C-alpha cells in the first residue's frame, strides 16, 4: 500500500510540472487575447497562450521563465548571474 501511495505522489509531482495545454485543446482554445500590450505579445510559460511581452525595466525570467519574456530587442538580464533560475530585468540589447 505504501508503494502505491509513493508511486501516485511521484506521478502527481511529474504531472504538476507539465503544461496541460499540450494535450488539452480546449485549454488552448480558452486563452484570452491580451489587450493593450505596449510591446506586442509572446507565448506564456507553456507556449499555449499569447501574453503581453515585458517592456524595458520590467521583471522577467525566473524558473522556467515564469516571470515572462522580454519584447523583441530586449534581453532579460539576470540580477544574480550565478543562479540559472534567478529573475531579471528587461534591458535593451
From Swiss-Prot:
Signal peptide: 1-16
Keyword Transmembrane helix: no
Expression (tissue specificity): Expressed by the venom gland.
Any GO BP: regulation of cell growth
Molecular function per GO: insulin-like growth factor binding
Keyword presence, NADP: no
Superkingdom in the source lineage: Eukaryota
InterPro entries, per database record: Growth_fac_rcpt_cys_sf, IGFBP-like, IGFBP_rP_mac25
Listed GO CC annotations: extracellular region
PROSITE patterns according to UniProt: IGFBP_N_2
Main location: secreted
Name of the protein in question: Venom protein 302
UniProt entry keywords in alphabetical sequence: Disulfide bond, Secreted, Signal
Location in or out of the cell: Secreted
SS bond partners: 19-46, 21-48, 31-49, 37-52, 60-76, 70-90
Amino acid at each position: 500500500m505504501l508503494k502505491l501511495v509513493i508511486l501516485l505522489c511521484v506521478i502527481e509531482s511529474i504531472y504538476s510540472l507539465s503544461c496541460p495545454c499540450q494535450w488539452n485543446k480546449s485549454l488552448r482554445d480558452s486563452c484570452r487575447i491580451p489587450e493593450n500590450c505596449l510591446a506586442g505579445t509572446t507565448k506564456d510559460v507553456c507556449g499555449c497562450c499569447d501574453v503581453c511581452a515585458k517592456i524595458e525595466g520590467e521583471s522577467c525570467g525566473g524558473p522556467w521563465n515564469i516571470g515572462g519574456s522580454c519584447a523583441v530587442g530586449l534581453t532579460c538580464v539576470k540580477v544574480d548571474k550565478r543562479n540559472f533560475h534567478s529573475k531579471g530585468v528587461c534591458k535593451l540589447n
